[in-house]
Amino acid sequence: FRNLPIAQLTQSEFSAFLTKLGVGAEKSISIRQAIKNSPSKISNLITTPLMLTLVVIVYEAESQIPETLPEFFDRLFQTVFSRHDRIKAAFTRKHYSGLSEKSLQRLFEAFCFMSLQSGHGRTISQSQFDEIFDHACEYADQSNCDSMKFKQDIVQVACLMLEDGVDSYTFLHKSIVEYYAAAFVLSLGDNNAKMFYSSTIEKSSGWEETLRFLRSIDSFRYFRDYVIPIVNAERTEVLASIVDNSNESIISTFKRLYPGLGVYFRMDTETKGAVKVSAYGSIIERSADHLTGLGFLLMDALAEMTINVNTIEELNSQFNAHPEHAIDDLGVHVPAEALLRAYGAAEVRKAFDSYKNKLDKLADEANEIVGKENKKSLIFSRRQSKSEIG
């Protein structure tokens, strides 16, 4: 046996598929219009007939498409079990696991978190499924069931995962594992949630979309324990080192943060004697880039600096570099330091200024959200004051 790729479902095919589902013409129009107008951009998730089916089920239960993706996924789990049962009165879905809907959802959230924590992708093997399940059971209350029955609930009943070949299982959409992993973090107490956010400050790779969901559903702790520490660290590590705004401080900071960044040039096969940019080198992962994109700002600056480097002659005379000397298909590499010394640091200085503005905006947003939440503690002090007066 072998797996064959299938084309993604397109919006032009929604109408025909809804007809196949038995959806009437009027309701079909309403559903397609709701999908199109949804502020949550739910249409980006609908790449398979099954995903469209689940969207229809949620729409029938809610009479609308939830406004945000977190709201959609929250409604989705409830809908595929209890709410769908009430809509289809003659149809009762059996919970193979024997768990209540709430306990099953908590276990699935832990399962999704452990899947990401283990570094697995969207598709996992049977042995990986069992291993993740065992870990998830350790962190989900009232989860007394076995792996096979849990899998039946998630694959056969909820359809949030699919059998993919003989010995593997795939999440219906990558956003499913990312959202429910975020929901698991939301359920954690303050100390454990803070440990999670601290760990992603050190290494955010693989957690980027989960963090975006947490920005919506756990905004207070997201900004308090993740954004504010990153902003403070970046102001110290980056902005403080270029406070004098000199070329030398900018060059040394650039080299320290992104030592592999530069520009690759290769010969332009369409124009004799011409060169073109083929790549910008490697970026060492920095968690702050997930929030501010400093690495991409600096690549844009390098692009502006080299916009007039068009010929082999100029490349060779300025940097003693010739595409014929390239050791791979990328071309010949010119380090960022050489470019900065040749053309000055004005463009990179602009990039750091943009970076500072982004940090300032993040700090303002974070302080506003955290401040509003902290202000709520005054409610209790006022109650106490009134009782003392009485």
Role assignments for model-derived ranges:
Residues 1, 8-169, 174-176, 184-187, ...:
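Extended hydrophobic
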Residues 5, 29-36, 135-171, 175-390:
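Leucine-enriched alpha-helical scaffold segments used for protein-protein interaction
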